[in-house]
A protein has these predicted regions:
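Secondary-shell segments that build the walls of catalytic and ion/ligand-binding clefts
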Residues: 119-186
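Phosphate/diphosphate-binding glycine-rich loops and adjacent basic-rich segments that engage nucleotide
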Residues: 70-145
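General beta-strand structural signal in soluble alpha/beta enzymes
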Residues: 5-7, 28, 34-39, 60-64, ...
Length: 279
């Protein structure tokens, strides 16, 4: 029910779908499949790979051990990656449950978006160079690796009092399963950009009737959606629902792009002599 793949220092977005295909085939035969990948690079959106299992009426999981950029709780040195985890489960009439989140206080890309949009980071997202959480809005840090950034991401939770030990523990879990278990080390070791990946597929039919599972998922999702919202909020949503609704809207109205992204595409197309079209 297991396999291990050498990523050949290539993009994880290429090899991870293949790894999930292998995990799915193993799950069809024995109920569960787990595949690890070492010596790889960025795998893109973790939930993309987890959702491949959903397409086969299975529960999918994907996690990736990333290069360091996040402080451990009580730490002043970034020794852990953002280490995202994605889990996806099918439903019947409702959209799939899809959880996909970095185990840092905020995803690394949010820092780049803040720089691009000229906005500040919220309190508890980053710490200064001595590891003290910055509990006020602050400009996004200057990019850098191995100690050269101007500030560092905190674990999910921000401070120990607000539960950063939980985010810290989850990052460690990903380093173990998506790093050490792959045989390829972890973010800090071997000292170069190093990604390890872990994918798993759970065949629902090996545990219970698939139709009953999906029916109960609908019931559970409806329970969440129908629960009472807090003041200032219209409704309660479940993980994956906002993204599902965004796909529907953008399929009709198009995808909004920041002008810097458009300029980047123009420049790259010009360098490579590729026609540029924007519709």
């Amino acid at each position: 029910a297991t396999a291990n793949i050498d990523g050949d220092r290539g993009l994880g977005i290429i090899v991870t779908p293949k790894a999930m295909d292998i995990a799915i085939e193993k799950a069809k035969n024995v109920g569960m499949g787990v595949v690890t990948i070492h010596n790889s690079r960025h795998l893109g959106m973790a939930s993309y790979h987890a959702l491949k299992a959903v397409d086969n009426d299975m529960i999918g999981m994907c996690m990736t051990s990333c290069p360091p950029g996040v402080l451990p709780t009580f730490g002043a040195e970034p020794v852990l990656g953002t280490n995202p985890i994605a889990i996806a489960a099918p439903a019947d009439k409702e959209a799939p449950f899809v959880f996909d989140a970095a185990m840092s206080a905020v995803a690394g890309n949010k820092l780049g978006l803040a720089r691009r949009n000229g906005t500040q980071l919220l309190a508890g997202w980053v710490a200064d160079h001595d590891g003290s959480p910055i509990m006020e809005e602050v400009d996004p840090p200057t990019p850098g690796y191995e100690g050269s950034a101007s500030s560092y991401l905190l674990p999910l939770g921000g401070t120990r009092e607000l539960g950063s030990h939980k985010g810290y523990g989850m990052m460690c879990l990903v380093d173990i399963l998506g790093g050490i278990l792959t045989g390829g080390g972890y973010g800090m070791n071997p000292g170069r950009p190093n990604f390890g990946h872990y994918v798993a597929a759970y065949n629902i039919e090996a545990f219970m009737d698939t139709k009953e599972f999906k029916r109960t998922m609908d019931e559970w999702i409806n329970m969440l959606n129908s629960s009472k919202p807090a003041p200032g909020h219209d409704r309660v949503m479940y993980p994956g629902q906002p993204e599902h609704e965004a796909v529907i809207e953008r399929s009709k109205k198009g995808i909004p792009l920041h002008y810097e992204v458009i300029d980047w595409f123009k420049d790259i197309c010009g360098e490579l002599s590729i026609p540029f079209f924007l519709v």
